[in-house]
């Protein structure tokens, strides 16, 4: 991750190699966190290179997909509990709606009125699947529509900072 961040010019971040779900948002190291890039483990169904290596890798089993989606939901909801959080980017290299669009409304409902979706790269034409109000703010790519790897991005921002 450090190599990727340096490659794209990110210099104002701190990486922590910990179990994210075990991190306390009130820990002095994290209570002033304003921005989170959440890229949890996923099926990788949007990664064409995985499918070339293993043709069966493109479609996860329902059991694996359910387990991954559960973990992703816990991670997303946990990230939204950081008291100073202003903006979160949720990204997936998956084509599965269960890992992408289905995560967003559930997380927003856990924090009613505290967060909203912000447009993710609004100039890009390919948006999230219309599965919930606001999905048009999400970004979705796939080998079929964008001739790229598959991915999903949702930008969630705090409506009002806590006092």
Curated annotation (Swiss-Prot):
Name of the top EC class for this enzyme: transferase
Molecular function terms from GO: RNA binding; RNA methyltransferase activity; S-adenosylmethionine-dependent methyltransferase activity
InterPro entries referenced in this protein's UniProt entry, alphabetically: MeTrfase_RsmB-F_NOP2_cat (IPR049560), MeTrfase_RsmB-F_NOP2_dom (IPR001678), RCMT (IPR023267), SAM-dependent_MTases_sf (IPR029063)
UniProt-listed Gene3D superfamilies: Vaccinia Virus protein VP39 (3.40.50.150)
Tissue spec. comment: Ubiquitous.
Coiled coil: none
Record-linked Pfam families: Methyltr_RsmB-F (PF01189)
Keyword list, A-Z: Methyltransferase, RNA-binding, S-adenosyl-L-methionine, Transferase, Williams-Beuren syndrome
PROSITE patterns assigned to the protein according to its UniProt record, in alphabetical order: SAM_MT_RSMB_NOP
Active site: 93
GO BP terms, alphabetized: RNA methylation; RNA processing
Keyword S-adenosyl-L-methionine among record annotations: yes
Disease (UniProt): NSUN5P1 is located in the Williams-Beuren syndrome (WBS) critical region. WBS results from a hemizygous deletion of several genes on chromosome 7q11.23, thought to arise as a consequence of unequal crossing over between highly homologous low-copy repeat sequences flanking the deleted region.
Family named by the database record: Belongs to the class I-like SAM-binding methyltransferase superfamily. RsmB/NOP family.
Name of the featured protein: Putative NOL1/NOP2/Sun domain family member 5B
Protein source organism: Homo sapiens
């Amino acid at each position: 991750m450090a190599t990727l961040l340096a490659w794209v010019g990110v210099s104002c971040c701190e990486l922590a190699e910990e179990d994210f779900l075990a991190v306390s948002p009130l820990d002095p190291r994290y209570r002033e966190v304003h921005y989170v890039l959440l890229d949890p483990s996923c099926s990788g169904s949007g990664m064409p290179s995985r499918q070339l290596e293993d043709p069966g890798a493109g479609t996860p089993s329902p059991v694996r997909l359910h387990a991954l989606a559960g973990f992703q939901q816990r991670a997303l909801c946990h990230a939204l509990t950081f008291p100073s959080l202003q903006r979160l980017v949720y990204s997936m290299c998956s084509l599965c709606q269960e890992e992408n669009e289905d995560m967003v409304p559930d997380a927003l409902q856990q924090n009613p009125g505290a967060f909203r979706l912000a447009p993710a790269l609004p100039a890009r034409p390919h948006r999230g699947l219309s599965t919930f109000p606001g999905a048009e703010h999400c970004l979705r790519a796939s080998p079929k529509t964008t001739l790229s790897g598959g991915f999903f991005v949702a930008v969630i921002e705090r409506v009002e900072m806590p006092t």
